Amino acid sequence: MMRGNSFKAVNIKVVGLVVTCLVFSPTALSERLYAQTTPTDKMDAVMSAGYQKVWNKEVQARIDRDIRTYRMADATLQFAGSVNRKGVRIEQVSHDFLFGSNTFLWGDCHSPHNDSIYSNTFGTLFNAATIAFYWRDLEPTKGQPRFAAGSPYIHRRPAPDPIVAFMNRHNVNINGHCIIYGQPFAIPAWMPDSRLQMDSLFKAHIQELASRYTDKIQRWDVVNECYDQVNRHLMPDDYTFRCYQWANAFFPKSVSLNMNECDMHWPTTDINHYVEIARNLLFRGARINNLGIQSHIMSTDEMEQMAEGTIRYLTPEHIWANLQALSKAERPIYISEVTVCAPDSTPRGLAIQAAVTRDLYRIYFSHPNVRGITWWNMVDHGGFKGEPLYSGIYDVDMRPKPVYHVLDTLIHQEWTTRLTQAPDKNGELHFRGFKGRYRITWTDKKGHRHESFIHLDKDGAFQL
């Protein structure tokens, strides 16, 4: 993949591409786009020689090779009838890999127009969404959960029902975050200080979520950040294991149950401890389908260190070592929460954010056991108190930032297969494409148009 040239070519066409993706008028969008989309050469120009040394040509070549090896598959199309020699149109219409963001500012972007931009990012740029289910804010008053539209307002905690309905209509994969979170700020204020009483309340809470959403939500972070057992709230005995037992009993088997933990900054020894917690739970019979790991760059100073190439962590070697360690749990990996903050809102700061994001997404996408990546706060100034101001892919006025265009280019251009190709002399057509669903269209020799769909998830032949 030509990292240096592909993004420059996109700049000429980027407005048209965004209009194609998003369901807004061209006029409205063109007025809101940044004047500069920061092509790759400009992003590279703000990154130091030290950064370029860390993310060198050999590293990039290895990432390219691994993406081609692990994210693509060979397809053979076999046609029952004749095919016009003008060729067959092959268009990828969806990805197996999940690219998402949280939905914490749903309906809270200061105008209906901005809210529309926010919501319509799902099903266009992103095919996955993380919806907030923090118990303390979901049920601030015991027995009065805030599920439905019109529930009392809490910042960054929108009522989940309307979001679930939207995502289901648009075939967006949903992750519920999170059922149980042991930190004091996440447990309902009305929770009794009795392990025994908490036990029955936890069980009932999990059962209520399973009953209400059944398979409408495809993935759940059952227990969030269970690694730290020192600074947590009073919790029921063996609560992590028991929560997975209850979730397994109440949710359909089609629903995936996740663990979620901090952070890719950790030394690999700490990642190994997380893996051992997961393996011990699995050994005892817990159903854990996926392992989540967070990747937050919350410090502007850290971003400057990234740009200088002096940071100790989040180097290609460190990232790969941690992903390999996580793989020892023998479960798919989700990069569950990604924050890449800009050092500031200057063109240089935005270019640094875009460049770091490009490299992090590429290496995460290249690992065979990673199944999805979720951007955390989609809008600047939209984070939790104390989190960085410039960590969005949109600014506060919902204008796409350079990092937005980086993600759009990676997901919908570099990592999407579209081609027109004629069958060989045997009537077969061979191609290698990114894993996902495809629309195949062709015309036979009598001029009749045909359309078929295939799901390419591994090497295989398809009879059309």
Task: Give the location of each predicted region.
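Short Pro-Gly-centered beta-turn/loop motif in secreted/extracellular proteins
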Residues: H110-L125, L429-R437
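Bacterial Sec-dependent N-terminal signal peptides
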Residues: M1-T37
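Substrate-binding cleft and catalytic face of glycoside hydrolase catalytic domains
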Residues: T124, A128-Q144, R157-M264
